[in-house]
Design a protein with these regions (language model features):
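Residue-level recognition of conserved beta-strand positions in structured domain cores
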Residues: 21, 67, 88-89
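Short aromatic/basic micro-patch
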Residues: 24, 50, 88
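Catalytic beta-strand/loop cores that center a nucleophilic Ser/Cys/Thr
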Residues: 35-82
Length: 114
């Protein structure tokens, strides 16, 4: 899920969503803490275009954080047992220079399941 989809995944699985401490719509540098799968080839940092009005405050059980930033503790997460991923930022816009790599990595994850 991207942005709201990321938040809906968290809420559906029992996580907590709330208003961001710093509302912003801007370029942000994220810290990639797990560069397997979704962020393969992108660590340790990446510039992204992010929207922070609401955000995931607490991840659900069986999820792990993949990326964070100085504005948001949960920029990205994944389920530990399923191929369920969420990202707060927007990889689809040109303001996220390496966003297409995230989509390519996600496509590779999906191909392994077919």
């Amino acid at each position: 899920g991207i942005c709201l989809g990321h938040q809906l995944i968290a809420k559906t699985y029992g996580g907590q969503i709330d208003t961001s401490n710093t509302e912003s719509y801007a370029k942000v540098e994220i810290n990639i803490v797990n560069d397997e799968n979704l962020f393969a080839g992108l660590a340790p940092k990446m510039e992204v275009w992010s929207s922070h009005k609401d955000e995931v405050k607490t991840i659900p059980d069986d999820f792990e954080i993949l990326a964070n930033s100085n504005l948001c503790d949960v920029e990205s997460f994944k389920h530990t047992k399923k191929d369920v991923y969420g990202i707060q930022f927007h990889p689809e816009v040109h303001h996220t220079p390496k966003g297409s790599t995230i989509f390519e990595n996600f496509y590779e994850i999906c191909k392994k399941k077919v």
